[in-house]
Amino acid sequence: MAENRNSYLPKEDHERWQKALNDKGWLVPDWPVEFGGPGWSTTQKYIFDTEMANHNAPGIMPFGVRMCAPVIMKFGSDEQKQRFLPRMLSGEDWWCQGYSEPGAGSDLANVQTIGEDQGDHWLVNGQKIWTSYADKADWIFALIRTDRDAPKHKGISFLLMDMSDPGVETR
């Protein structure tokens, strides 16, 4: 897939490519018009994706616009939609995914990273691994255990965290 060709491109090239697609209205063919997408039909999206693949075009950075944005569109507050979606489109913010953990791998029911509600913020303690583009990302969306007493398939929350917050580090 096109996303696999992203690893050799420098961040600046990704940003230029994403901007060029966004300027044409082609960055997120599956987004609804109300959030900045073109409102294309399934057939139009298929033709676009096929042509991009046929021409060996680079993929886009999927974590923000393809993975996190749909969650924000469906479950986010109006403030979150206004704050994050335009910056995802513009490429101003880069995102990474924080799911896998040491000892749990991709078994999300075994997430051990803990989040405690502090009223105006969450205090998060734990470690994520295999986090592609963490070294380039401005934000991470992560699955965090927020209810220690809940059964293991429950009590997990989807948190958005600023990678520049104190205590966040990449190795």
What are these regions (language model features)?
Residues 121, 125-171:
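A short core secondary-structure module
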